[in-house]
């Protein structure tokens, strides 16, 4: 949908499409018609029907949809909310993983702790099970 083709809807217009035969909802100020997707939704059609005609942004984000699901949404977009009725709910981003190496201090701790534990275990073993002189 190019920016020239964008259709704008009010919340009242979206609210009228709240049945199994016409299932629209709002996510991040975009309007989606997911009627054709009802039977394919992995969470079942009930989840989508429950949100029909409403702003489903919070529910959508709470579930933690994958990037594939977010990409798939684009084909069901039919328009956007009119500017006066938009909300400011930030999109949740995918978690980022920190792959940076730790400093030398933490690498020293990584071998020091097992060494100390091994030493303590050895001393305890020798104390309890050490050779006894006769």
UniProtKB/Swiss-Prot annotation:
SUPFAM superfamilies xref list: Cytochrome b5-like heme/steroid binding domain
Binding of heme, residues: 41, 65
A Pfam match: Cyt-b5
Transmembrane segments: 111-131
Keywords of this entry: Electron transport, Endoplasmic reticulum, Heme, Iron, Membrane, Metal-binding, Microsome, Transmembrane, Transmembrane helix, Transport
Recorded GO MF terms: heme binding; metal ion binding
Keyword Phosphoprotein annotated: no
Cytochrome b5 heme-binding domain boundaries: 6-82
Membrane topology: Single-pass membrane protein
A Gene Ontology cellular-component term: endoplasmic reticulum membrane
Compartments it resides in: Endoplasmic reticulum membrane; Microsome membrane
Entry similarity comment: Belongs to the cytochrome b5 family.
Physiological role: Cytochrome b5 is a membrane bound hemoprotein which function as an electron carrier for several membrane bound oxygenases.
Protein name (database record): Cytochrome b5
Source organism of the structure: Musca domestica (House fly)
Gene this chain is encoded by: Cyt-b5
């Amino acid at each position: 949908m190019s920016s020239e083709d964008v259709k704008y809807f009010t919340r009242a217009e979206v609210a009228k499409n709240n049945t199994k035969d016409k299932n629209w909802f709002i996510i991040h100020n975009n309007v989606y018609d997911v009627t054709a997707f009802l039977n394919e939704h992995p969470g079942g059609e009930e989840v989508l029907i429950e949100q029909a005609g409403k702003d489903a942004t919070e529910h959508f984000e709470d579930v933690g949809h994958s990037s594939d699901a977010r990409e798939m949404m684009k084909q069901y977009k039919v328009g956007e909310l009119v500017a006066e009725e938009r909300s400011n709910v930030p999109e949740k981003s995918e978690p980022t993983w920190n792959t940076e190496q730790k400093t030398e201090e933490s690498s020293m701790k990584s071998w020091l702790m097992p060494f100390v534990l091994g030493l303590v275990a050895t001393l305890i073993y020798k104390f309890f099970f050490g050779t006894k002189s006769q």
